[in-house]
């Protein structure tokens, strides 16, 4: 950084590699004063006119709008609002062809001017130094200010860098042939541009501002030198005419003697660059409360009768501008938006002027012949010699045709500024920039799709983690609830055991009475005189009772058997049998013996029945 400071303080101008010197052809358009174009019958305002996202419509079809009224809100990221260039009625919100080489339609707001040109309420702010820097950034963003010298990057986003800024460079080089919009703006509005530069320096906090102008603009140089004379922190740098010395990285190398490293931004070196037209728009936004609703456009080419620079309301159709400038078409006429090096041929002229439109070029075929048929590369190397980014254009072209995007990335395709110097010197008339733009677009699309896929993957993983976390939390809640219920049940059981009920004694007495009644009944059925034992007797007492009953029954049986035997013996002794009576007596004895046996069997069965009942009665008492 010290080397940069020393080089800047020396006032030297360095050189950058490559570059060309095409015919300038800025006259006669640069010699005509600025004019104002009348409002067209309709103004077509695409929702997106800058790098970044488009906003959402805040108006409806049929609604009346005032000049400077916001038509859209700002998008969340790199968004800028759109404003009505004049008062009128919203005619439509529909798809219209856009200012692009493809001519593809995009969403646009169509306004029919009412001729009154009535402004919304405005609040001028001449005391910008009394306001907070963040507030000024909000004002610039709300005014829809985008870079007017390049791709249209939102100015507020560029100024809101969180890194220290050592140098603010204001680009007034305007190196491309034919284009002279910044030249006329510096000639006629030098003090307004300087005010915008002061606001930008205040926001960035830099102590040094460098104003760079190409040496082919002597009138603009004189005008700006007078305007900055009272400011010691603004220095004028006059750079030699060479294309593309107005490129951001090329101009930084000219003024600082150092090249911006590949894949880095100027802010990494402590530098911010803005166009002179952007500085003018910042002044109008902050001090005059005027949003970006118009810009200076160069109308030039041999097929225009009145070439010059005009204040064109944004949304003005190109065909309306051509009619105003006296357009006289010829066969196979080309209408180019931009310059001959970086511009593109419009497929139709019913497309609008947008924030990044700086020139409408209508050349004759003699003045600017159309490109011839593409031929094979002869490997002459001329394209590499003029490349200001020190790339290998022919190698990039082969890789772009092969769609070898990783190799294009390795060969620094995105360092290409699409200046067109390589195509300008190509003897085979290969549209090299066309291939680079296509490859860049496809690579950006791939990067966007990959970013979407990565985002979707992260969302899925986050969702799965959330579901798993919720499941674990749910299970933990259930576990804690079960433990709480278990503890509650144990506590209730403990409390119940510590506080017995009055009914417990009554229930025990009733159960004992029922048991005694059952035991008594069982004893009666068995014919036993053994008193019934209480139901709550021990198992050993019950067993002794059963054994006593069985022993008594056995003694009774033995006694009866002995008595029966004695009776039979007495009968035989009292009645001695004769020889003749013995058969009859034997027969009677056999009958008596059979009867006795039958009685014994009957008694045995009855005794067995009684024993069974006696044995069942204690079991039933135990169960009860």
Each model region followed by its residue ranges:
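Hydrophobic alpha-helical positions that pack around
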Residues: 207-314, 318, 326-328
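Acidic low-complexity segments
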Residues: 92, 97-148
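Ferredoxin-type iron-sulfur electron-transfer modules in oxidoreductases and energy-metabolism complexes
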Residues: 357-371, 384, 388-501
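N-terminal, Lys/Arg-enriched amphipathic/low-complexity engagement segments
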Residues: 1-58, 110
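Conserved hydrophobic positions within beta-strands
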Residues: 88-90
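Charge-dense, low-complexity intrinsically disordered regions
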Residues: 499-624
């Amino acid at each position: 950084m010290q080397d940069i400071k020393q080089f800047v303080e020396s006032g030297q101008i360095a050189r950058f590699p490559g570059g060309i010197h095409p015919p300038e052809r800025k006259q006669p358009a640069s010699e005509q004063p600025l004019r104002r174009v009348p409002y067209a019958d309709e103004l077509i305002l695409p929702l997106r006119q800058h790098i970044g996202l488009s906003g959402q419509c805040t108006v409806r079809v049929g609604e009346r709008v005032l000049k400077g009224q916001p038509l859209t809100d700002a998008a969340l990221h790199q968004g800028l609002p759109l404003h009505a260039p004049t008062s009128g009625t919203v005619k439509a919100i529909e798809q219209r062809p856009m200012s692009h080489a493809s001519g593809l339609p995009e969403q646009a707001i169509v306004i029919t001017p009412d001729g009154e040109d009535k402004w919304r309420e405005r609040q001028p702010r001449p005391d910008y130094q009394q306001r907070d820097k963040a507030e000024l950034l909000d004002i610039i963003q709300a005014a829809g200010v985008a870079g007017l010298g390049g791709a249209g990057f939102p100015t507020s986003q560029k100024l809101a860098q969180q890194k220290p800024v050592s140098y603010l460079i204001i680009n007034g080089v305007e190196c491309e042939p034919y284009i002279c919009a910044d030249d006329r703006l510096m000639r006629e509005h030098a003090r307004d541009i300087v005010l915008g530069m002061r606001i930008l320096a205040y926001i960035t906090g830099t102590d040094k501002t460098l104003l760079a102008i190409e040496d082919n603009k002597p009138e603009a140089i004189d005008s700006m030198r007078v305007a900055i004379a009272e400011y010691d922190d603004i220095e004028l740098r006059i750079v030699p005419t060479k294309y593309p010395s107005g490129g951001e990285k090329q101009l930084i190398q000219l003024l600082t003697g150092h090249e911006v490293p590949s894949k880095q931004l100027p802010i990494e070196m402590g530098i911010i660059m803005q166009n002179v037209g952007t500085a003018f728009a910042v002044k109008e936004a902050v001090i005059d409360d005027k949003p970006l609703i118009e810009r200076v456009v160069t109308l030039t080419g041999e097929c225009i009768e009145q070439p010059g620079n005009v204040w064109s309301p944004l949304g003005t159709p190109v065909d309306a501008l051509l009619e105003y400038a006296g357009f006289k078409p010829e066969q196979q006429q080309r209408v180019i938006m931009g310059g001959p090096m970086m511009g593109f041929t419009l497929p139709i002229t019913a497309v609008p002027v947008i924030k990044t439109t700086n020139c409408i070029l209508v050349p004759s075929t003699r003045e600017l012949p159309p490109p011839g048929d593409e031929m094979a590369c002869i490997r002459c190397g001329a394209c590499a010699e003029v490349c200001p980014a020190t790339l290998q254009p022919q190698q990039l072209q082969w890789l772009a045709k092969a769609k070898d995007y990783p190799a294009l990335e390795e060969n620094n395709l995105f360092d290409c500024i699409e200046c067109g110097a390589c195509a300008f010197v190509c003897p085979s008339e290969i549209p090299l920039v066309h291939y680079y733009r296509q490859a860049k677009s496809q690579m950006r699309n791939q990067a966007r799709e990959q970013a979407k896929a990565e985002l979707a993957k992260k969302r899925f993983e986050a969702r799965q983690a959330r579901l798993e976390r919720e499941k674990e939390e749910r299970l933990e809640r259930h576990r804690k609830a079960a433990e709480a219920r278990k503890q509650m049940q144990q506590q209730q059981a403990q409390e119940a055991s510590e506080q017995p009920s009055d009914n417990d004694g009554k229930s025990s007495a009733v159960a004992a009475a029922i048991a005694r009644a059952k035991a008594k009944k069982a004893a009666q059925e068995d014919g036993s005189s053994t008193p019934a034992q209480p139901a709550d007797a021990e198992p050993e007492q019950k067993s002794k009772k059963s054994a006593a009953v069985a022993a008594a029954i056995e003694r009774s049986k033995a006694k009866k058997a002995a008595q029966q035997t004695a009776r039979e013996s007495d009968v035989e002794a009292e009645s001695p049998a004769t020889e003749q009576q013995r058969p009859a007596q034997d027969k009677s004895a056999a009958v008596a013996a059979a009867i006795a046996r039958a009685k014994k069997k009957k008694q045995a069965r009855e005794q067995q029945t009684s024993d069974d009942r006696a044995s069942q009665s204690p079991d039933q008492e135990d169960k009860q």
